[in-house]
């Protein structure tokens, strides 16, 4: 009996997923009404100091929104600033807020993180948040 129990325990530990294995985005799906506020969360990979936000639609494809390095906004040239805002208050998360949502805001919003070392940035993407505005 003891060897079988030990075998089961070993299997359980082998199947356990590591924490902080990748970029985490919440919620995965969000449905909201026109004129509401939507807040999207991103948790970068531990140790990564750069966070990027993108929006992806069928018509426009992947669009850059904003980029943070060491919590400071570096480039927000892609942000529709009248209703969109992003923050990175600490190294553990970033938020993207959309005020007064419109149907054209319906898209998949992607967050990526990077070590931010050297000249190039190898980005690791989260699963995305699918926002639907009715």
From Swiss-Prot:
Residues 116-119 are annotated as: D segment. Residues 120-134 are annotated as: J segment. GO terms for biological process: adaptive immune response; cell surface receptor signaling pathway. InterPro entries: Ig-like_dom, Ig-like_dom_sf, Ig-like_fold, Ig_sub, Ig_V-set, TCR_beta_variable. Residues 1-19 form the signal peptide. Pfam families: V-set. Keywords: Adaptive immunity, Disulfide bond, Glycoprotein, Immunity, Immunoglobulin domain, Receptor, Signal, T cell receptor. SUPFAM superfamilies: Immunoglobulin. This is T-cell receptor beta chain V region CTL-F3. It comes from Mus musculus.
